[in-house]
Amino acid sequence: MKAMIRRSGVGLSIYMSKKDVEEPVVAVENEDLWGGFILVRNGWLLGLPDLPQGTRLPITVEAMKQPDQD
C-alpha cells in the first residue's frame, strides 16, 4: 500500500491514504529505516523498500503490510 513517511517533532509518522490512517512509528528494524520493518502504533508491521541511506523525508513509498501473527 502507498504510505507517506514523515518526521515530526515527536518522531516518525506514517500516513496510509488507502486506509485514511496516520499513526506514529513506534519501532524500526534498521537504524537507517530503509529495507527493513517498522512497527506502527496500531500494531501493523510494515516492510519498507530498500532506499539509499540519507533519503529525505517526507517521502511516499510502497509499504508491505505483514500478515497478522498469532
Curated annotation (Swiss-Prot):
One of its GO terms (biological process) is nitrogen fixation. Pfam families: NifT. The lineage of its organism: Bacteria, Pseudomonadati, Pseudomonadota, Alphaproteobacteria, Hyphomicrobiales. Gene3D superfamilies: NifT/FixU-like. To K.pneumoniae and A.vinelandii NifT proteins and to the N-terminal of R.meliloti MosB protein. This is Protein FixU. InterPro entries: NifT, NifT/FixU_barrel-like_dom_sf. Keywords: Nitrogen fixation, Plasmid. It comes from Rhizobium leguminosarum bv. trifolii. Coiled coil: none annotated.
